[in-house]
Amino acid sequence: MKKAISMMLATAMAATCLAGCGSAASSSAAASSEAASSEATSAATSEASTGEKTFENNELNIAVFEGGYGSEYWDEIIKRFEAAYPGVTVNIQISPKIGDIIRPQIVAGNVPDFISMNDNDSTGLISSMVKEHALMDLSDVFEEGGIDDDTPLKDQVIDGLLDSAKCSPYGDGKIYIAPFDASPMGLVYNKTLFEENGWETPVTWDDFFELGDKAKEKGIALFTYQGIYPGYLESMLWPALASATGIDNMKAVASYTPGSLSSDEALKVFQNMAKIGSDGYLMDGTVALNHTQSQTDMMMNKALFIPNGNWMEGEMADAPRADGFEFGLTCAPVLDDGETRYVMSSVEQFEIPANAKNPELAKEFLRFLYTEDSVKLFAEKANGIYALKKANEMVKGIVTDGVYNMNDIYQEGTFMVFGWDAMPDTSKVVIADSVFNVASDVMNGDMTAEQWRDGIEAAFEEIAASK
């Protein structure tokens, strides 16, 4: 469950300082003659050397969260960076528990120069750094051209991303967090099953439930989700609300603005979500399942849709599935045909701490990560796609067909991200409790759509009162 589980839990964890200990794989990737002789590395070396940059401090210390993408990309990109900048040494700490590992180091003043870690990580480290204004302003990096493309980096990144709370957490137009990849999220389905039955993916909520009635006749549920990890529902709820209430209103939601979900249109979305459970469209047993169980059931054609992202293909590579199963991804339903459909994106992130000892080399490393060579390497080693406009075409034929095809959802809907603004220091609200942790109650009929919506609005009121 690579990305979405803790998306809505970050706020709850942000105030928790975990001074956990652990061991990270630590290495210094030295440039080898073999790496330097490779065509890709030679190209990167030539590109980077054009600027003939030198640095007073040639040692770069980076900390990387090791998630579903693994470590191979990082091992190789470090070799290529060192080859491109002779004399530079990169020391890496990489671990699934990197937040717990580097938190005590940061407290002790041993701050990494560069971090690859998300603001929704369960340790709450990056969220805490945002609250404490402990991240460096990276706006100058994105105003500059890239290493291998003179276009300013800000114009190379997918539209709307740098302006979002994921990259500009204070809403002041300054970039403090850099985007890594932007994986599309939505409703995963089996393209083969739809083709065999002549079904079209639904556009409106009416279409969605009509399709559910057809599926019932074949003994297939319309919908399932990762029951005990309800945060996955974000890839359906937020785009649906954006379509119904307007994308600008989602900025108000993200900043906990009272009344931002009080409209009739917003309520209709909550009612449609609740209808999945109340009217028998939810796969039996869903609320008790974990992510792998529910995803496997969907892949066995027990349900038409499950909310997830394009990483599901890799995550479920060894899972059983229906014969001929082919991954597809479609947008959340809209209230009325003609409304803008949105594609929620799960964004992984890079940071440079405000008190990094070698910020200039860290910034150059960040620029190096956005080169075409790096983008293709990430696709090759991790089956991932950078958050750049041209990245999907750069990696065609490198990433799997499933990932490439699911990225085509951007042709169907408009890109959006959703990230909560920094919670006021004075607030004790756990926003996840009101938004997604009540999902099982809603689906079981123990909470109405109105109560669900009103509970979120009450949380917003409490947050506003604490400011």
Question: Predicted regions span which residues?
Answer:
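Extracytoplasmic "Venus flytrap"/periplasmic binding protein-like
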Residues: 80-160, 192, 196-200, 301-305
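Extracytoplasmic/periplasmic substrate-recognition and gating elements
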Residues: 79, 83, 89, 107-108, ...
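C-terminal capping/gating helix-and-loop segments adjacent to ligand/active sites or protein-protein/ligand interfaces
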Residues: 254, 343-344, 384-387, 392, ...
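Short, well-ordered beta-strand elements
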Residues: 55-67, 88-93, 114, 176, ...
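Hinge/lid segment of periplasmic solute-binding proteins
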Residues: 48-50, 123-184, 209, 236, ...
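Short, solvent-exposed loop/beta-turn-alpha elements that line the ligand-binding surface or hinge
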Residues: 137-157, 244-268, 318-322, 331-342, ...
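Extracytoplasmic/periplasmic solute-binding protein
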Residues: 49, 166-180, 185, 209-258, ...
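Glycine-centered hinge/linker elements that transmit conformational signals in sensory
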Residues: 214-215, 255-287
